[in-house]
Regions:
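Glycine- and charge-enriched low-complexity intrinsically disordered segments
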Residues: 119-129
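A short, polar/proline- and glycine-enriched secondary-structure boundary/capping micro-motif
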Residues: 47, 83-84, 115-118
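Short acidic-glycine-tyrosine-enriched beta hairpin
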Residues: 74-93
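A short, N-terminal "cap"/entry segment at the start of jelly-roll beta-barrel domains
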Residues: 1-46, 53-54, 128-129
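Conserved hydrophobic/aromatic positions in well-ordered beta-strands
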Residues: 35-37, 63, 105
């Protein structure tokens, strides 16, 4: 799920401050981790996710695309293009490919994503050996 920042409803616009609020933008429980990513064009994390259920990331993410464009493919087959300025929610069961050089910030359930990152590290070791 993605939405442009400018499309989020304004709840306050006064005294030089504008506040926007988007309710029901995913659900989370537990401690979150903050993550900052930079991808070169063409980076596809799919090979690193092979072996996880449905060969996809099993952690949900909330975030903001600072620059570039990425394509998210969900395990059901749907795809979504997310570009600079988009707020995103990616539920568990997805992969990501950078269509151009991209920078993004994500927030993820810490325990869930640590498990995925450990798996990705193991896959990277196999693929680069």
């Amino acid at each position: 799920m993605r939405t442009r920042s400018d499309d989020i409803p304004v709840v306050m616009d006064a005294l030089g401050a504008t506040a926007r609020h988007q309710p029901e933008f995913g659900t989370a429980v537990g401690t979150l981790a903050a993550e900052h990513y930079r991808f070169e064009a063409g980076v596809d994390v799919s090979p690193l996710l092979e072996g996880l259920p449905d060969d996809g990331c099993q952690a949900p993410h909330w975030g903001y695309i600072i620059s570039g464009r990425v394509t998210v493919t969900y395990t059901g087959g749907d795809t979504e293009s997310c570009s600079a300025g988009d707020l995103v929610y990616w539920p568990a069961g997805h992969t990501v490919r950078a269509d151009e050089p991209s920078e993004l910030v994500l927030f993820s359930p810490q325990v869930d994503h640590q498990a995925v990152m450990a798996h990705m590290g193991d896959r990277l070791a196999v693929l680069t050996s």
